[in-house]
Amino acid sequence: MLKCVHFALGENTMGTFRMYTSDDGQSHFEDIDLSNTPDWTSAQATTGITFREIPVGNFQSWHPAPRRQYVIILSGQLEIGFGDGSKRVFGPGDARLVEDVTGQGHTTGVYGDQPCVTVTIPLANQ
């Protein structure tokens, strides 16, 4: 069963995740606990910000990330596939540090019947 983490007004939770390439060349994810990850809560140098609306039905086959970047979902949902065959659905408020810049990468597709709006924040010196 796919797990979907939601962020809604009035709730004090949001999903924070890291996507990375392990020694086997496959992409994986891990949940990030902000209280134990000070580098996530301190200022970081970035190179810009991009807002994107991804249409319903959009699917990208295996690809590594073009650079280390944060991707935050503002609305809609994305389903990300990983090298071990698992899939995870990310929704509004979920923030991902995408670091799987080598290896097979991951798949990305819009999940559900609404477009997905994301904000991408590339990290500097990556």
Feature-to-residue mapping (PLM):
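Short acidic-glycine-tyrosine-enriched beta hairpin
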Residues: D84-E99
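A short, N-terminal "cap"/entry segment at the start of jelly-roll beta-barrel domains
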Residues: L2-E53
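Short beta-strand segments in beta-sandwich/barrel cores
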Residues: P38, F59-Q60, Q77-G81, A95, ...
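Short, conserved beta-strand element in jelly-roll/cupin
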Residues: A65-I80
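A short hydrophobic beta-strand segment most commonly corresponding to one strand
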Residues: L97-V101, T107, Y111-Q126
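Conserved short histidine dyad/triad with adjacent acidic residue
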Residues: L34-T37, G48-A65, D100-G103
